[in-house]
């Protein structure tokens, strides 16, 4: 096991806040594997790179020799996390939650080592909790303290409804730490209230309080708003290799350092060397290619990453392409949005038609439906389909 100083440096990499650092140092000094918990409510079936920030940190804890607990909130998922919400979230059914949970496990084990991961479901203890124990849990906190939470306070002061079951969410999440006897809990910055609840409840149940590590919310491809499927600025971890690669290579130059720190498993020394190269005149795109290849390889394998780099990622299956597939070469000074490529290649009548097709899911690149966020990278070759009958293999070359 690495020294306490080395462990602390890796643990704090990219983190927003560590509470309480002195307590964590004391835990690490004992030289015993710590129980590291992170909870995920399976409210949607697909994960994007923003979700993997926490999972990557769990992987780092595994590499340090600690015991990682991947907690699936099948019970809390039916409540709905109110964090940051201005209205009550509709609860999911048990069937929806369990179906999504199975998909989660398949995806996260592309990052975590299954042999070193304990998968837990919080329904295991919550379903067995009787009325007396539940009343004891709710007695650990007051309504006044609950209303100190920013989102609840805003809704209360603006006369927006707060359902009683929403007060239960942070209590149940906090009790998860009691049930698992967690030493450290990870969460996004928007989860700080819930994480602190875990510390408080552990003390109330006679346990040593966990330390909490908050991780930032990853910015999306625009570099401004947090990554979100609804905003279209996301990279799904199940997206086709070519699509994933193209999106990552097209991120703003300034954003790539944030992505390297939070998404890459390269050392900070290596990342700082890349930064020095760029400051010395290296092309930022060459560095983004390294990032894109690493991430594509993580989810699809080395061969898929190499193919994506060559513009050959995820070709359409034989028989789906016309025999006389047109070959089109375009030139440009920089990467181009897919709408402009389709228009310039003659697959659509005009840019407006391209935008309409993209909005309706009528555009495929290498067999995968893409939206307007897809960027055609200089040097790439893709098979493009606009509508049902317009096909072309398009290469975008540098002017």
From Swiss-Prot:
Gene3D superfamilies: HUPs, RNA-binding S4 domain, Tyrosyl-Transfer RNA Synthetase
Binding site for ATP: 229
A biological process term (GO) from this entry: tyrosyl-tRNA aminoacylation
Domain of life: Bacteria
Cellular component GO terms held in the UniProt record: cytosol
Keyword terms, alphabetized: Aminoacyl-tRNA synthetase, ATP-binding, Cytoplasm, Ligase, Nucleotide-binding, Protein biosynthesis, RNA-binding
Entry protein name: Tyrosine--tRNA ligase
Chain segments annotated as transmembrane: none
